Structure formats: C-alpha cells, structure tokens
Amino acid sequence: MREPAFRLNYLDELTSAMTMLARHPKTLFVGQSTRYDGQAPFQTLSGVPMDQRIEMPVAENLQMGFCTGLALEGFIPVSIFPRFDFLILAMDALVNHLDKIQQMSEFRPKVIIRTAIGAM
C-alpha cells in the first residue's frame, strides 16, 4: 500500500482553521481557555491575536447568550466549549434565543459553535 504524500495533523489543521477565521476583523473567540493556557482550546488559538479572544467563566448558558448578543451587534463569535457535554448547558440560549432570531426578524446572526469530542 502506498504512503500518502502528506499526513494531516488534527491539532495543526484546527489551529490553521482558527487562524484563517481570525483574519476577519469582526471574528471573536469566546470561551474557557482562550486567553490562558490550560486546555487544548488555547493551543489551537496560537495564530489568533489576544484582542480577538474573550475569556469566559464556567457558565455555558451565559457564554451562548453573550455570543448571541455579539452576533446581534454584527460580530462573528466563535463560541468554544472545551467538551461537547458542556454544550448541553447552553441549549436554552441556543434553542430559545439564537435559533429564533431569524424567524422573528430579517436578521441572520452568525455564530460558530466549536466543541471537542475525545482528546487531541
């Protein structure tokens, strides 16, 4: 069997994607471990300027509501949850607020939700 010409590294590709998203001046990265080292999300933001990162407390519903507000103001928040099971705690703001905005108005908010399953 032939070896592939190159190998993809998940961490490197995720870091590259976050760096690409950061090129847009209205993109903000919101979540835990965005400004302070400690978990994998910090490592993947190495190409993102600190002024585009917002550190949040452990309050997932607050984080999703905050991102909804940022989107209403024209920003493109990337809401980062360290693990997928924490996303369950943000479902109220996601399903009852963010999801309804387009139906209640002509506005289409842009929010990117990023979470991880497994380890990097």
Language model regions located:
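Thiamine diphosphate
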Residues: 1-120
